[in-house]
Amino acid sequence: MAGPRIMFVSSNGTGLGHLTRSMAIARRLDRDTESLFVTLSRAAPVVREMGFPVEYMASHGSPTAGSDLRWSRRMTARLRAAILEADPNLLVFDGILPYDPLLATMKRVPATVWCRRGLWQPGASTAPLTRSDLFDAILEPGDFAASADAGPTSSRRDEAHEVPPIVFLDDAELLPRADAERELGLEPGKPTILVQLGQGPEVADATARCLRTLARADGVQVAAASSAISGLLDVPERVVHLRSTYPMSRYYAAFDGAVSAVGYNAFHEMVRFAIPALFVPMRRETDDQGARARYAASVGVALAVDGPQDERIEDRLGELLDADRRGAMRERLEELRPDNGAREAARWIEALAEPPREGLTTHSVGNPPLGDGTQRRSSLRARAARAWVFVRTIPRTITRLMNQTLTLPRPTTIILAFGADEAAIRDALNRAQEPFERVLLVTDSLAIGEVWRAGTGAEHVPAPGEREAELAGGDYAEFRRRRLGLILAGRPRLRSALTAGEVPPDLVDAATAPPRRRGRLLS
């Protein structure tokens, strides 16, 4: 008898946090339990590399997505199709805001879980929390800095099932130091500092400062994760550039210290695997990275500054370069080291995915009653809170939609790329003779990093033989045609179409047909 099927849905965060937590849980589920992923994150290729079926759907802020209203309608239809085809026993959402298309479609799933991390900014909007009761259960991944949590979720822990901090790997999965050094191309046995501050304009200067300071130090090797130096024009010669290293924690035995941002993943991996670090918090709308960094420094497990512009970075790097200082931090880390909550979360989720035993209305794990999706009822207070959020944001929403309608670029050219590599896709993009933001790419490939970085909007159709196509049943050509119809729904007519790989002529004709005729051809 086949085991339960669980669909993990993640939002488009600023890093890999949402996806990594979901994969950490999925890889510890019973082997009879099937995991599927739907994500709005461009890190979808990582999910595939880890062996999980994944379907990427572009987020509302992506090029060619159109207005929020058009995106929401299109996303609702796509999610509904994915859920109907997969027929999961349980849906797990990891993100800050459960978006409307998800809420509209997850009613079809027997049980739903919001994986909702804590440590929100004290002033963060509480509007997302008014949607908590629309889920059957809340899972809260623990935070090492939980005692410093002054955000809005800190008073709502009684509604959540909390587990220890979730990290991707277990101790036994880390490479021994010699093996890690060899795979990364590092000089064996030399003290090594890792720099992984992420990317973006706010961190470029801080990254450059860190690399310059560390590269001048005698007897120390400096390694920078790929994202940390992307966009930098001047990388010191002594810095080792690390590429394709996910999960980075697999190589942590090679490092004696680190300079790191303080997102959930990086922070808890450093703490869990006892890496003395200088934490540089980034400003985020919800995640209180500053609180994490300050707490870690206050209990002696790390060094911290206030942010990427902090003038004390060089001084703190001097402390990090001190072997005795690192040794003291490592001892403290070993003393306070938290458990990995991924396995406990997996067992809890598996229990939710199984229907209650006959005669019971609840599971033994203490979650709310589970219905068939149609029986969920929100409390009057929660419905009133959501209604108030809706009413008070009407003027802002109308203004935003009007601005989007007037200013957002509309795609004029579509590239259909099936069975094509990225070189062929780039060639088609160059032949388009249109600004990249006016080109919509529809492809069965996720190896399109350069295309994404060029600013081209992309949508994904699972390839032949992939699990999503199998679950849909029937002929693959029909599956692909339906997916293309959902992707193009509500979009204006496209003037031209280019192809890469093997694309049937009827798809090209349908893609460039007037919207009404296009809908009939692709339905």
Regions found by a protein language model. Give the residues of each.
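Donor-nucleotide binding loops and adjacent catalytic segments primarily
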Residues: 178-257
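C-terminal amphipathic helix plus adjacent low-complexity
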Residues: 315, 321-404, 521
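Catalytic binding pocket for nucleotide-activated donors in carbohydrate/polymer assembly enzymes
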Residues: 266-315
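Short N-terminal targeting/anchoring amphipathic segment
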Residues: 79-97, 488-503
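Conserved nucleotide-sugar phosphate-binding/catalytic loop shared by glycosyltransferases and other
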Residues: 2-14, 28-81, 306, 452-471
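Acidic donor-binding loop of glycosyltransferase active sites
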Residues: 253-266, 275
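A short, glycine/small-residue-rich beta-strand->loop->alpha-helix junction that serves as a flexible
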Residues: 9-21, 46, 202-203, 416-427
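A nucleotide-sugar donor-handling region in carbohydrate enzymes
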Residues: 121-124, 131-192, 197-199, 390-398
